[in-house]
Amino acid sequence: MNYSKIFIFGIISLILMALFSSTVESVSLKNLKIKNNNNNNNNIENKHKTKKSLELTETQDFGSVKCPDGSLCPNSNTCCSASDGSYACCPTPNAQCCSDKQHCCPYQFTCGNGGNICKPQQGLRFSFNR
């Protein structure tokens, strides 16, 4: 019996189970609130003088996603409207913001069960080349 074929079959089976599972847990926006960046008092001459000023300007200097209210999310995040009217950062690019305004789902997934789960988009297919 060829053990390498059994091992490869086992790995492929695990990958397929992970890819075709019916749901994925959604990301909660509760702890992902962001600070509004409408304060334009940052002076270029002194923005790196203290640790505090460096923390305040770090996201501005290294590519950020600007939300409709002017707040910023780290690069490759998605701005989602939160239930309190502010914006929160979903930590995945091109995410789906759920209608409950408390969760988000990764790209190519849709919100289900009120936003508690993420389901693969209809018609989503995976192909494996040999």
Swiss-Prot record:
Pfam families: Granulin. The keyword Disulfide bond applies. The keyword Kinase does not apply. Keywords: Disulfide bond, Secreted, Signal. GO terms for cellular component: extracellular region. Granulins are disulfide bridged. Gene3D superfamilies: Granulin. InterPro entries: Granulin (IPR000118), Granulin_fam (IPR039036), Granulin_sf (IPR037277). Disulfide bonds join C67-C79, C73-C89. PROSITE patterns: GRANULINS (PS00799). Residues 1-26 form the signal peptide. Its main location: secreted. Transmembrane segments: none annotated. It comes from the Eukaryota. It is found in: Secreted. Belongs to the granulin family. This is Granulin.
